Amino acid sequence: MSQGAMRAVVPIIPFLLVLVGVSGVPTNVSSTTQPQLQTTGRPSHEAPNMTQTGTTDSPTAISLTTPDHTPPMPSIGLEEEEEEEGAGDGEHLEGGDGTRDTLPQSPGPAFPLAEDVEKDKPNRPVVPSPDPNNSPARPETSRPKTPPTIIGPLATRPTTRLTSKGRPLVPTPQHTPLFSFLTASPALDTLFVVSTVIHTLSFLCIGAMATHLCGGWSRRGRRTHPSVRYVCLPSERG
């Protein structure tokens, strides 16, 4: 063989060995276990148990239980339960010595019956039910009253406060404004009146000055351009 063929065959040899080893293991196991399964149909108790390595010389033996060798179930005390369930008020149970013992009857109801309540009504004191309408009024907590603040020249109107009943308190203005758009501040009213007078006088002065200037210019025009008078001269008759 050539060197190229040898190089191609050498990597395949380990894979072939692994395949041969894997395929040979299950065949050996099946050959050893097949006679036992054919003879009995199930693993016998007398045959030696196999270990994981496939050898039969294992000193330890595992006991396999079959449905035929199931241990009997312990008997449950059903009779005692039936006797306890059948026991009621006034019923008798058999004791250990063959005698029948009576159970103590259950006590009466925890709550009194309606008949007992009706019988005890005359003996009980009558307690009036509380009326929500006639409940005593709670004392109102007094709030500290602060003195009114001094109203400045540009102060806004005081805020309304709520009474204890939930109604707003209408503040009483200390000063009635001159116009509706003014606030309740006397200093603001004075400032408004003074500014109105100053603006009125300034407009009057401006109007008077404009009239005086316009009248002077008209008079000067007349002096520089006097009016021409036409006079009828007598005709000369020769």
Swiss-Prot record:
It is a single-pass type I membrane protein. Residues 28-42, 49-68 have a biased composition (Polar residues). The keyword Signal applies. It comes from the Viruses. Residues 78-88 have a biased composition (Acidic residues). Residues 211-238 are intravirion. Residues 1-24 form the signal peptide. GO terms for cellular component: membrane; viral envelope; virion membrane. Belongs to the alphaherpesvirinae glycoprotein G family. This is Envelope glycoprotein G. It comes from Human herpesvirus 1 (strain 17). The gene is gG.
